[in-house]
């Protein structure tokens, strides 16, 4: 659920993920050990990740309502601010943000907004 510094967007369920992050945020933890990344002593990254998911969903929703195809919608999604927030100027983190987060997660958000089932794996 929490991977840092770049989250993985493959096979995600955006609305469920956002609800799960909210539940985790409400839990009175003192230390959060993410699936990848340094231990966290606060909720800063949780808030950043929740904001990222919410922003993508809010950009995708009107495009889905306008019946844009995934390819058409993807061209209209602007993640430049989020990319800077998560990757900074690091070229590797930028590449990982694009490949591991932006491409798969925007597709999952588009599928969710269009009522298309999100499946895990090949079968």
PLM region spans:
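C-terminal regulatory/interaction regions
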Residues: 65-123
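Metallo-beta-lactamase
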Residues: 1-55, 59-62
């Amino acid at each position: 659920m929490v991977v840092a510094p770049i989250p993985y967007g493959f096979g995600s369920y955006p609305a469920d993920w956002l609800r799960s992050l909210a539940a985790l945020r409400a839990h009175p933890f003192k230390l959060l050990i993410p699936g990848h990344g340094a231990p966290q002593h606060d909720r800063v990254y949780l808030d950043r990740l929740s904001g990222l998911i919410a922003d993508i969903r809010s950009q995708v929703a009107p495009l889905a309502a306008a019946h844009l195809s995934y390819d058409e919608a993807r061209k209209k999604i602007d993640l430049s601010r989020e990319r800077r927030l998560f990757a900074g100027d690091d070229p590797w983190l930028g590449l990982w943000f694009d490949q591991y987060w932006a491409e798969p997660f925007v597709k999952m958000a588009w599928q969710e907004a269009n009522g298309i089932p999100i499946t895990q794996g090949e079968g």
